[in-house]
């Protein structure tokens, strides 16, 4: 039986693990398998990534080059653009992007492309796992029929499961091995074998009754966050209107030991999950005639935060008798969260675009991001790229306004407070001590 054969391969670590997509999810995953004794083949369409891995270099903050080098040198890890190597894998895990179309509908093209490559080269006796975030039903409605078209039967010829990735880039406390793993198969055998596989590298595995439960689990997690961040952002705007310190309110509320979980406002939401996942859930809801109002309201509030930040900047400049048009604006941090280089859906990009459209002279400093490019299709201002500027005293002193969009720890905020004439702090990066000792006009979210 396929279940018994795969179980034996997994337990004795002779199974070859294939991972399609070597980004923030796929690279840490395959390295973890290789460090635990498995042979891994990473599949990637980006030749530069393949070259870097082959040379023993990591391009992901959560994976050290030392670990990549070790896995490559001992023959456990190879990276390739040749998808025919899928035939040599006993397990194939899909870790590809799942973006949105311009219409905010799910873009399934990456999952479908990965499925088509598997379909070409699959053989009997393989376990396929989808980790990419998607709507409930994708695993059994999209992938299963593709594999069965080849004449293979579930449980007899292949197994199929979904296990949502839970990567938190730049979080050293939670890495692949200690983030609990939810696993749901299209069949009971699929669940059992997939759970066994992940138990080899993850401390805690939580099997569920179906792939759809696992798919819905991930969307529930991130929709919960998006909605609560939306509430925090709305409360911040209300507190500003009332002249109340938003951050002090949150700190006070967080002293309640039950029934409250602290969420914090910001310039908007970014990353590969929070801005996108609720749309997958609401899209699926619409297919069944269900109107997910909470999701829509949260998206409206969160997507409006960059414009609100620009409004704060405009008002602050007006207060010192300056217009946005022609003002020199310095953006501190363009990554979507601190201490990483990931700019996906970063609200800083929207803020830059809105300010450029109003005639501001924009520069940015981010120790992790050397260059920012803009998609012409989504840009209302200039679409020319920007390049990282060194954070010199003159740059801060000569800026009409400094906007803290991302609170990277490497930035010297004391120096910023000493030199910048006007600061808009969207992340509560400036302590009370720094604010009180500064001559700058400081506006906080």
Model-inferred region functions:
Residues 1-445:
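Structural/interface elements that position substrates and couple domains in central-metabolism enzymes
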């Amino acid at each position: 039986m396929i279940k018994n054969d795969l179980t034996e391969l997994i337990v004795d670590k002779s199974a070859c693990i294939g991972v399609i997509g070597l980004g923030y999810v796929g690279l840490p995953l395959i390295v973890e398998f290789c460090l635990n004794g498995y042979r891994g083949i990473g599949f990637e369409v980006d030749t530069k990534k393949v070259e870097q891995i082959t040379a023993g270099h990591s391009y992901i903050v959560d994976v050290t080059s030392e670990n990549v080098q070790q896995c490559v040198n001992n023959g456990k890890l190879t990276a390739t653009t040749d998808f025919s190597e899928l035939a040599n894998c006993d397990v194939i895990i899909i870790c590809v992007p799942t973006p949105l179309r311009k219409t905010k509908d799910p873009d399934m093209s990456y999952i479908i492309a990965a499925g088509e490559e598997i379909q070409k080269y699959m053989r009997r006796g393989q376990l396929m796992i989808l980790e990419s975030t998607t709507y409930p039903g994708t695993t059994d409605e999209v992938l299963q029929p593709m594999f069965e078209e080849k004449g293979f039967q579930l449980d007899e010829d292949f197994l199929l499961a979904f296990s949502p990735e839970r990567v938190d880039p730049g979080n050293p406390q939670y890495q692949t091995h200690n983030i609990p793993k939810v696993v749901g198969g299209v069949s009971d055998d699929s669940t059992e074998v997939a759970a066994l596989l992940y138990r080899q590298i993850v401390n805690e595995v939580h099997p569920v009754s179906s792939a759809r439960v696992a798919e819905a689990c991930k969307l529930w997690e991130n929709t919960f966050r998006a909605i609560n961040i939306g509430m925090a952002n709305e409360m911040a705007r209300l507190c500003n209107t009332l002249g109340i310190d938003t951050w002090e309110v949150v700190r006070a509320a967080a002293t309640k030991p039950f029934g409250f979980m602290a969420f914090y406002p910001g310039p908007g939401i970014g990353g590969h999950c929070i801005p996108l996942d609720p749309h997958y859930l609401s899209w699926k809801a619409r297919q069944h005639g269900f109107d997910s109002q909470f999701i829509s309201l949260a998206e409206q509030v969160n997507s409006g935060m960059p414009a609100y930040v620009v409004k704060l900047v405009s008002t602050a400049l007006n207060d010192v008798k300056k217009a946005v048009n022609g003002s020199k604006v310095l953006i501190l941090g363009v990554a979507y969260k601190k201490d990483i280089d990931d700019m996906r859906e970063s609200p800083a990009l929207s803020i830059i675009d809105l300010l450029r459209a109003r005639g501001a002279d924009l520069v940015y400093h981010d120790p992790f991001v050397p260059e920012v490019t803009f998609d012409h299709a989504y840009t209302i201002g200039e679409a020319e790229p920007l390049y990282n500027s060194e954070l010199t005293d003159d740059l801060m002193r000569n800026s009409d306004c400094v906007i803290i969009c991302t609170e990277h720890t490497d930035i010297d905020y004391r120096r910023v407070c000493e030199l910048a004439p006007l600061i808009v702090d969207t992340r509560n990066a400036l302590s009370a001590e720094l604010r009180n000792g500064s001559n700058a006009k400081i506006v906080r979210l």
